[in-house]
Structures are given as C-alpha cells and as structure tokens.
Amino acid sequence: MCCVCGEQSPDLKNGLQKQSRSARRSASKKWRYQMNSFHYFVIFASGSLFSGLMFGLLNYAPKYVLLPTRSAPHHLPDGKFLQISDEARVMEPYFPAVRMAGRLGDGNNGSGKIRTEPHDTNEQEALSSLKVAIEMKTMGKDDKAARLFQHALALSPKHPEILTKYGEFLEHNQQDVVRADHYYYQALTVNPSHSEALANRQRTAQIVEHLDQKRFERLDQKRDALSSVSDTNMALKRAEKEAYIQHIYHSVGIEGNTMSLAQTRSILETRMAVDGKSIDEHNEILGLDAAMKYINATLVNKNDFITLKDILEIHRRVLGHVDPIEGGEFRRSQVYVGGHVPPGPGDLSILMNHFESWLNSKQAFLFHPVKYAAMAHYKLVHIHPFSDGNGRTSRLLMNTLLMRAGYPPVIIQKQHRHKYYDYLQVANEGDIRPFVRFIADCTERTLDLYLWATSELSHPVPLLAQETMPDGVPLINSFEKESTIEGSGAGEAIRIGTI
C-alpha cells in the first residue's frame, strides 16, 4: 500500500484476489462434498428401507400374493383314501360322482332338499319320464314303469330324486333290496340330506349287510368242502391244471388278448408260437404264467406279510416278456384311464407305502377274506402305479390273498369284462360294495367248478363261458344269462384227463 495516497500496490491487490478465489474454490468443494455425502446417505437409507420392506413382505405377507405356486390338481387322493373303515364309502371327495353334485342345482335351499330346477333338455325329459314312470307304477304296469325309470336314470344319472324313486320301485315292486340300497346310497352321495333316501337307507342297510354276510358264510362252507378233498385226489389235480389255464386265458382276455382257450393251452404246454397272433399276445400269456408260478412258489405259503417288494416282483414277471424295462418299476408319466385320472408319478411312492400299510393292518384283516382281497384289488388298480399291467397285477394280488385264505384262484370271465369295469367305475363313484359282490360271485362260480369236477362222478370242468353245468344245473344265479359266448370251442366241456 502506498504511504502517501493510501492505495494498494498492484502486487498486493493481485495477491488478495488470488486468496479470495482460492477461498471460494475451497468453500465450493466443501459444499459439494457435503452434498455428495447427503446424497449417498439418502440413497443408502432408501435402499435399506426398501430391502427391509421386501424382507417383511416375503416373510409375513401371504405368499400366493407375491409368488405364483404350481400345485397338482385336487383330484389326487391322499393317504386317508387308503384307510377305509367302512368299505361302502370310499372317500367321496376323490371321485367325480361327488364333484358332479354341484351341477344338479345351486345349493341347499334350507328345506333339506337340493334344488333341482331343470336347466337343460336332458333333465327336463328325465323328470317327465320319472313322472310317467310313477304313474305306470301306481297303475300296476311294472314293465313300462321299469323302462321309464331306466330312461330317466340314463338321462340324469346323478339326480337324487330319480335315484330314490327308482330304488323304491326296485325294492317294493321287484324285491331287489340290494340294488335299491345302492341307489339310495348314490342319492345320499349327491344330497346327504335327502329325507326319503335317508329313511329308505336306514331300512335297507341292515338287510343288505345281513345278505352280504350270508353270502360270505356260503362261500366259507364251499371253501371248507373243497378243502376236505385230499391233495392226492387226481380229479382235483386235473381240475387245478385246467383252472390254471382258464385263469390265464380269461385274465389276458379281459385286457383285449385275442388268443382262444385252445391257443392259450398250446402256448403254455408246448411253448410254441401260434400262427397269426402278435408277439405281444404270446408274451402276455407267458408273463402271466411266470407271475402265477412265482406266487405259487413263494407267496402262497409265505409266513409273513405281503410287501411292496412282493407286488413289484409280481409285476416284474407280468411284463417280463412284454416290456422288461418297465417291469417292476413305477410309471414315470401321468396316465388317464377313461374318466379316472390316477395319481401323478410323484405321488406313487408314498401312496404305495400307504397301501402296503393298509394291506397288513389289523383293520384290513378284520374283513372277510373275499372282501379283503376285492378291496386290495380295487385300491391297487385305482392307484394305477404301473405304465402297463395294472389290471393283471391287481387280479394276481387278489388271488394271492385268496389262496393264502384257502380259496382257489378266482377266475373273472372275459365275457363279464364290461360288468367288471362297470363295477370298478361304481367304486370310483364312492360305493365299493357292488364290486365286492361281483368278486364274491366270481369266487362262488370258481368254487362250484372245483366241487363239480371233484365230485364222485369225476365230471368235466366246464368252460367258464357257460352258465350251467353240462347236465343243466346252474352254476350260480348271480349273473344274467349271456346270449353269446366268446372264444373258440365255446359250449364244449373240457374233459378232465385230456390235458
């Protein structure tokens, strides 16, 4: 600064300006640093808050809101399905018959009856037919009434009123209390509060149970009579051999095998191929033969429970010649059997373990042997654990259980395959009793054949396509007459001693 005039020197002025600019730059840097720190803090805090919110939502909010889940259809049965204490009710929620109930109306109207207002042409026609059927019944025209009831039922098979009225007609006009009870049961499956069906079922249930018990007692008497025949009886040995061949013939025939009885016998006795028949049809016969020999050699006299391993060994032999890779193995894909959708492959292991537990439970052992074997057959074929051979394996398991109880292996005729499948479907709809009765009828038919063949006259073993013995005596009266007989050589009697 100049001492005389007081002005700053140029050098000093320039120095002060530089210091001022430096101070401003420092202040600016400090401000930017502070702002950057604040921004970083805000970003960090926001990220932390967002992470905390997401963590809370994922752990406490309903997961079906945030994450789409993949689940199997609810038509699959669970373990409870295999724990049946009352064989008449097979866990209805797993069967299509119960799910169809909602199609009959909108729900219960508070009066104890499901609304059944006609909502399509079929139901309108069914109810009209029902009305006329009741009029014909009142007038004593039972033949016309029966046809009209059946027509109404065909149009609307799950209508509780039609089921109940048809059951009443069967019970009172045709004295068929067993079938009547079945229709009352079906009506209650659709509408558990149907008052008429409830009253009717309370009346018929004990009667039907008594009739079923008498049937089982009759089977035991015939089994005991057959057991009294000496094992060295030559007629018995020949009958067993012939029944063995017929069992294989009918069992593969149920599945569609076109071999005749004579051709089946030729394959089993000579192991030679039959002209004009596929390799698979030959191998189906050989596989069933191998499985039956395994059962006779190991399982019939086994002093232990039947295990899952035993069932797999049976199946391994059933498919041993047809598909050895799949034999004894659970299927690895979903299958569809008519209207029935079996469990998915991922559920088979646990379901089969549950089945094994039921098979060897005290509860199952309390059933009559025929009922026990029939229920085991149904349960296994319903699970459908294999890609092929489920029916043959189920029938073989059934016969294993029967033979362990002193019964001969039961033959289900190929001529009755439609009844066989129909009764399985009825069981799918919730009532297994008709299927058990069907197996009981087949058991009695087989026992009658053995007793006839081992009588003092040493009769021939009739073909199971016949409904009567060679002298006209009926085998049993449980089946309707068949108008046609399948298979070559039908109507002839197989003479004991010719094989």
From Swiss-Prot:
UniProt domain comment: The fido domain mediates the adenylyltransferase activity.
Protein name: Protein adenylyltransferase Fic
Activity regulation, short description: The side chain of Glu-255 determines which of the two opposing activities (AMPylase or de-AMPylase) will take place. In response to endoplasmic reticulum stress, mediates de-AMPylase activity. Adenylyltransferase activity is inhibited by the inhibitory helix present at the N-terminus: Glu-255 binds ATP and competes with ATP-binding at Arg-395, thereby preventing adenylyltransferase activity. In unstressed cells, disengagement of Glu-255 promotes adenylyltransferase activity.
Reactions performed catalytically: L-tyrosyl-[protein] + ATP = O-(5'-adenylyl)-L-tyrosyl-[protein] + diphosphate; L-threonyl-[protein] + ATP = 3-O-(5'-adenylyl)-L-threonyl-[protein] + diphosphate; 3-O-(5'-adenylyl)-L-threonyl-[protein] + H2O = L-threonyl-[protein] + AMP + H(+)
The protein's Enzyme Commission number: 2.7.7.108, 3.1.4.-
One example GO MF annotation: ATP binding
Any one of the GO CC terms: membrane
